[in-house]
Design a protein with these regions (language model features):
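Hydrophobic beta-strand-centered segment that forms part of the acyl-chain substrate-binding groove
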Residues: 2-4, 70-106, 132-136, 140
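Short aromatic-glycine motifs in intrinsically disordered, low-complexity regions
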Residues: 7-17
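Beta-strand-rich interaction surfaces with strong enrichment in secreted/lumenal proteins
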Residues: 11, 53, 95-97
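Catalytic strand-loop segment that frames the active site of acyl-thioester-processing enzymes
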Residues: 18-57
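Intrinsic-disorder/low-complexity, polar/charged segments enriched in Ser/Thr/Lys/Arg/Asp/Glu/Gln
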Residues: 21, 31-35, 104-106, 120, ...
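Hydrophobic beta-sheet segments that form the core/acyl-binding groove
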Residues: 26, 91-128
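Active-site helix/loop of acyl-thioester processing domains in fatty-acid/polyketide metabolism
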Residues: 26, 57-80
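Flexible glycine-rich active-site/ligand-binding loops centered on an Asp-His dyad
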Residues: 57, 125-142
Length: 142
């Protein structure tokens, strides 16, 4: 398992493509933990309507960035090569602060349990060392 991954290497693992790829780089990867980055720019398509004159990243896309980062971790594992990651559920999601254009999301995901092909993960997103969102995620693969 490679420690750092570029966007190209992420594209080899995930089926997501522009404009829906929401993780730009992997900074660190261990057996059950990963740290990813999403650089949020004013050019993101969702800022056109969310909200005009006061752009804020939609919370559901922050959750999707968490899920994609967790997906990179799952699909870096040999036993999951060639499968498609699916987001199976979410619990305890909270948004603490808004995310604006120019923010750099640091996305931390830890897989805490794998049972019969379903993984449970804890995820946190930070901007400038401030917690902006967290959730528990469920993953599976087909």
């Amino acid at each position: 398992m490679k420690q750092e991954l570029s966007t190209g290497e992420i594209l080899d693992l995930l089926p997501h493509r522009y404009p829906f790829l929401l993780v730009d780089r992997i900074l660190e990867q261990k057996e059950n933990k990963i740290i990813g980055v999403k650089n949020v720019t004013i050019n993101e398509p969702f800022f056109q309507g969310h909200f005009p004159g006061h752009p804020v990243m939609p919370g559901v896309l922050i959750l999707e960035a968490m899920a994609q980062t967790g997906g990179v971790l799952m699909f870096s594992k040999e036993e999951n090569k060639g499968k498609i990651p699916l987001f199976a559920g979410i619990d305890k999601a909270r948004f603490k602060k808004p995310v604006y254009p120019g923010d750099r999301l640091i996305i931390k995901v830890e897989i805490v349990r794998m049972v019969k092909g379903i993984g449970k993960a804890k995820a946190e997103v930070y901007v400038d060392d401030n917690l902006v969102a967290y959730a528990e995620l469920l993953f599976t693969a087909v």
